Amino acid sequence: MKTTYQGSCHCGAVRFEADLDLAKGTFKCNCSICFKTRAWLAPVAASDFRLLSGEESLADYQFNRRVLHHRFCTKCGVRPFSQGDGQLAVRVNCLDGVDPQELIDAPVKYFNMRHDDVKSPPAETRHL
């Protein structure tokens, strides 16, 4: 069942809300940027995401094939969400007031994007 979550960057300049069902799953990836930032994400349909404030505080980082836009707050540096190529995902650690038990119970799928393999998880995931 979807729940509407409020979310923000660390300084609060960027605020959003997203209708998510964390019980349907979250994901972690071992690509270079997700690994370096320890990203833990939840997919969200574009129609279920609303940027409430802070568009002017957002900057964009792209790399490699330049498909995804890794949006980050220019004031505090936090990346609350990524979007592009028909995808949108929010960082679960940017959800304000989320019950820790919901995060504990949320299934996590692992993607081996370091080797461009979306079908098989990495051999080791404890460090992600």
Q: What does each model-identified segment do?
A:
Residues 1-8, 13-128:
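A short Gly-Trp-Pro
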